[in-house]
UniProtKB/Swiss-Prot annotation:
Major subcellular site: cytoplasm
GO-annotated biological processes: 'de novo' IMP biosynthetic process; adenine biosynthetic process
Gene3D superfamilies, alphabetized: PurM-like C-terminal domain (3.90.650.10), PurM-like, N-terminal domain (3.30.1330.10)
Gene symbol of the encoding locus: purM
Pathway recorded for this protein: Purine metabolism; IMP biosynthesis via de novo pathway; 5-amino-1-(5-phospho-D-ribosyl)imidazole from N(2)-formyl-N(1)-(5-phospho-D-ribosyl)glycinamide: step 2/2
Protein's cellular compartments: Cytoplasm
CDD domains registered for this protein in UniProt: PurM (cd02196)
Protein origin, superkingdom: Bacteria
EC number(s) from the headed UniProt entry: 6.3.3.1
Pfam family, one: AIRS_C
The protein's name: Phosphoribosylformylglycinamidine cyclo-ligase
Length: 345
């Protein structure tokens, strides 16, 4: 071999300088998320975090998630500023349903070719989600992998750790017949069902930017960031008895509510207790989707389902209203009368 060409990592498609520029861009917003328990800053091999001193028997709760194919829609529409909020929401909402306070968050951002502006927008959204949920963004990984992703396409994943007092873990074991089921309103489809969303858009030949649904573009409805319920739910838990909380994600009503129901109980939901938001009505009509499939794929406007003792219903609704949440009585827990743990009627 006689060619004396000297190859570099950049020639292979990995731009270390771009990665360093990204770190410089995000330092400020990441710093805004710091909690007093966090030791050190960005740049270490690992992040250090002490447990809050208020806990007597602290139990760590962890979770990891992504945003699914909502990312594809965001990339197609070149809207990257709220995807990071979605990522945090999917993780921290899974923690808080067990009564846990999120402590810290880490992200993974992978792409074929690093676009600093896009990555900075995504990570700024992650920092915003961390601020909304009160957890610290303590680190992450930015992986530029030419040949693994097409061009500047990217994927994100998140990992979160929280803490709960052992005696205060919410696991559904206290749920009993007669409990009231409350709903917390969703901002839209959140981060689930987007493969079906994209199929409906293709099937109906719809341009989401040009299609108006109740005064705003369909794109705005579909890319609305996932609600982060952490502060509202922690406040509710601190003020009244809560028996269970279900985060309506993939699998919708049929699969998520049973995860917090003990044997011998059944959730009976009143379908007339709320009207589906316009975006779900549009999706159902445009895709000719059955109601059963809608309930299985989407949250249909319900982000969280909360089981409380019947005599705590009014108090819980008042607390949630004071916190600015839209909440209502969704149904009730009944003794199980068959194989189905969720009945919508």
């Amino acid at each position: 071999m006689t060619d004396k060409t000297s190859l570099s990592y950049k020639d292979a498609g990995v731009d270390i300088d771009a990665g360093n520029a990204l770190v410089d861009r995000i330092k400020g917003v990441v710093k805004q998320t710091k909690r007093p328990e966090v030791m050190g800053g960005l740049g270490g091999f690992g992040a250090l975090c002490a447990l809050p001193q208020k806990y007597r028997e602290p139990i760590l709760v962890s979770g990891t998630d992504g945003v699914g194919t909502k990312l594809r829609l965001a990339m197609d529409l070149k809207r990257h500023d709220t995807i990071g909020i979605d990522l945090v929401a999917m993780c921290v909402n899974d923690l808080v349903v067990q009564g846990a306070e999120p402590l810290f968050f880490l992200d993974y951002y992978a792409t074929g070719k690093l676009d600093v502006d896009t990555a900075a927008a995504v990570i700024t959204g992650i920092a915003e989600g961390c601020k909304q949920s009160g957890c610290a963004l303590v680190g992450g990984e930015t992986a530029e992998m030419p040949g693994m992703y097409h061009g500047e396409d990217y994927d994100v994943a998140g990992f979160c750790v929280g803490v709960v007092e052992k005696a205060d873990i919410i696991d559904g074991s206290k749920v009993q017949a007669g409990d009231t089921l409350l709903a917390l309103a969703a901002s839209g489809p959140h981060s689930n069902g987007y493969s079906l969303v994209r199929k409906i858009l293709s099937f109906s030949q719809t341009d989401p930017e040009q299609t108006q649904v109740e005064g705003k573009s369909l794109a705005d409805h579909l890319l609305a960031p996932t609600c982060i319920y952490v502060k509202a739910l922690l406040s509710l838990i601190a003020q009244t008895e809560v028996h269970a909380i279900a985060h309506l994600t993939g699998g919708g009503f049929w699969e998520n509510i049973p995860r917090v129901l003990p044997a011998g109980t059944q959730a009976v939901i009143d379908k007339n207790s709320w009207q589906w938001p316009a975006v779900f009505r549009w999706l159902q009509q445009a895709g000719n989707v059955s109601r059963h499939e809608m309930y299985r794929t989407f949250n249909c406007g319900v982000g969280m389902v909360i089981a409380v003792p019947a005599d705590s219903t009014a108090k819980a609704l008042a607390i949630l209203a004071d916190l600015g949440e839209t909440a209502w009585v969704l149904g009730q827990i009944h003794p199980a009368d068959g194989e189905h743990q969720v009945i919508i009627r």
